[in-house]
Regions:
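Canonical positions in the second alpha-helix
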Residues: 5-7, 40-41, 74-75
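Structural register within alpha-helical repeat arrays
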Residues: 20-21, 55
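Structural signature of tandem alpha-helical TPR/SEL1-like repeats
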Residues: 28-37, 64-71
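The feature primarily captures lumenal catalytic ectodomains
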Residues: 54-57, 61-73, 77-409
Length: 409
C-alpha cells in the first residue's frame, strides 16, 4: 500500500524512490505514466542522469528510436563524454537468404567501421553481428543494454576511429576464449581457403594475440607481416573488408570441421592409435571447476584413464592428445572444443551443471562430427540456490560417470 500511494505522486525525493515508482508503472503496463514521471523529474533536475537513462530506455522499448537516441546523446553530455557518436543501428545479416539456407559464404563490405570489443561491423545505420561474431550485443560496452524490445535495433556510443585501414583485408577478429576463437574466428576461414582467397589479403586481428591465437595463425601458415593488428575496445575504419560468415548450421560447421582436420592432418594421430582414455581437467581454472575432480580421477584411473590439463599444453599438444583419444570425459569448458580433432568413433562424456546445461555447443558439435556423446548434469553446488550462477563450481556423481564410461567401452 505504501508503494501504491507513492506511485500516485509526482514528487520524487531521490533516485531510489524515482526508480521504484517508474518500475511500478512499467509493471502495471503504464508506459505513458512512466514517461511522465521521467519528464517530471527532468523538470526539476534538467540533466538528471537517472531520469534520462530511464526515459531513453522507455522510448527505445516503445520503438521511438530517434527520440531515444536524442535522450542518450544528452546522457553523453551529462557524463562528460567527448569524441563519441551515439546512434541507432539496425541489425542485419551479411546475406539473410544464404544464412537461412545454412550455406558457407563471404561478402565484401566497403567503407565500414569495426568495433573491436565485440567485433561487430557497422555501416550506414546497419550493424552486422549475427553471422559476423555473434556475441550478445546487450552486454557490449558500446551498447550497454540499449537494445529495442523486438531485438532488431541497438543504440551504440562509439569513439571516433582510432585506426584507418586503407588496404583491403580479411575480417578474422579476436576472442579471449579458446573455444570461441576456434568457432568464431578460425572455422569460418574454411570458406575463404576453398575460394582461394585466404592468403590473398592481410588478416585483421587483435594486437594482443594470445599464445593459442599465435599458434593457430602460425599453423595455418600466415606470415606475421600479413597481420593487421588493432587494439581492443577501439574502432577501426576499413576501406574494404572481406568478411567470411560464421559457420552456424550443422552443414556449415561440418564443412569447417572437415577443413580443419585436413589442414592439421599432419598433427593428428593415426586412427589406429586412437586408443587413449582421457579425463580433461579444469584444475587450472576456478570458473566452473569440478570440485571432486580428484575423486573422479581415482574412480576412472583403474579403467585406464589419464588426466590432462589442456591449459598447460600447446595447441599442437592438445591436438595430439585429443586425436589419440577413444573416450573423453570432460567438464563443460573451452578445451572440449578439441573434440573436433578426435576420430568419429571417439565417445564424449560431457559433465555439466544445471546452471549451464542450456549451453549445447558440444552436443551440436558432436551431431556434426557424428561422435557419440553422453551428457551428465549435476545440481550439486557448494552454494545455496540463490547464489548459483553460470560460473559456479560443482560436484559430479562419480558413479554415474563410471557407469556411462562402462557403457561406452
Amino acid at each position: 500500500m505504501i508503494v501504491a500511494r507513492l506511485s500516485l505522486t509526482h514528487r520524487v525525493d531521490g533516485p531510489a524512490a524515482f526508480h521504484l515508482i517508474v518500475d511500478l508503472a512499467i509493471e502495471r503496463g503504464e508506459q505513458a505514466r512512466a514517461e511522465r514521471l521521467c519528464h517530471a523529474r527532468l523538470g526539476v533536475i534538467r540533466e538528471d542522469r537517472d531520469a534520462l537513462l530511464r526515459l531513453g530506455h522507455l522510448l527505445l522499448d516503445d520503438g521511438r528510436i530517434a527520440e531515444a537516441v536524442v535522450i542518450f546523446q544528452r546522457v553523453d553530455a551529462v557524463e562528460g563524454r567527448r569524441g563519441v557518436v551515439t546512434a541507432a543501428f539496425l541489425k542485419q545479416h551479411l546475406d539473410i537468404a544464404r544464412a537461412r539456407r545454412g550455406e558457407s559464404y563471404y561478402r565484401w563490405l566497403d567503407n565500414v567501421q569495426v568495433e573491436t570489443s565485440y567485433w561487430t561491423i557497422m555501416r550506414d545505420g546497419i550493424v552486422y553481428n549475427d553471422d559476423v561474431h555473434a556475441k550478445n550485443l546487450y552486454t557490449s560496452p558500446f551498447v550497454r543494454g540499449r537494445v529495442s524490445a523486438d531485438g532488431t535495433t541497438i543504440v551504440a556510443t562509439l569513439p571516433h576511429p582510432e585506426y584507418e585501414i586503407a588496404d583491403a583485408c580479411i575480417f578474422v577478429g579476436g576472442d579471449d576464449n579458446y573455444s570461441h576463437w576456434l568457432f568464431r574466428n578460425v572455422l569460418k576461414l574454411a570458406t575463404l581457403d576453398r575460394a582461394g582467397l585466404l592468403y590473398r589479403y592481410p588478416w585483421l586481428v587483435n594486437s594482443d594475440l594470445r599464445s593459442y591465437q599465435n599458434e593457430f595463425i602460425q599453423l595455418l601458415g600466415q606470415r606475421p607481416e600479413q597481420l593487421v593488428k588493432v587494439g581492443r575496445h577501439a574502432v577501426a575504419s576499413c576501406k574494404r573488408l572481406l568478411v567470411p560468415a560464421l559457420h552456424t548450421s550443422d552443414q556449415a560447421i561440418g564443412r569447417g570441421v572437415q577443413w580443419m582436420r585436413e589442414r592439421f592432418a599432419h598433427l593428428l594421430a593415426a586412427p589406429a592409435q586412437a586408443t587413449h582414455r582421457l579425463l580433461v581437467s579444469r584444475r587450472d581454472v576456478t570458473r566452473r571447476s569440478l570440485l571432486n575432480e580428484d575423486e573422479l580421477f581415482e574412480a576412472l584411473a583403474p579403467l585406464g584413464f589419464v588426466r590432462i590439463v589442456p591449459g598447460e599444453l600447446s595447441v599442437v599438444q592438445q591436438i595430439a592428445a585429443f586425436s589419440s583419444a577413444r573416450i573423453i570425459v570432460a567438464a563443460h569448458g573451452a578445451a572440449l572444443t578439441n573434440m573436433l580433432f578426435a576420430p568419429r568413433e571417439t565417445a564424449i562424456v560431457e559433465l555439466t551443471s544445471t546452471a549451464i546445461e542450456h549451453m549445447s555447443l558440444f552436443r551440436k558439435l558432436a551431431r556434426t562430427t557424428q561422435q557419440p556423446i553422453v551428457t551428465i548434469t549435476s545440481d550439486d553446488y557448494p552454494l545455496v540456490a540463490g547464489e548459483i550462477e553460470i560460473n559456479t563450481p560443482f560436484r559430479i556423481d562419480t558413479r554415474r560417470v563410471v557407469r556411462a564410461v562402462e557403457d561406452l567401452i
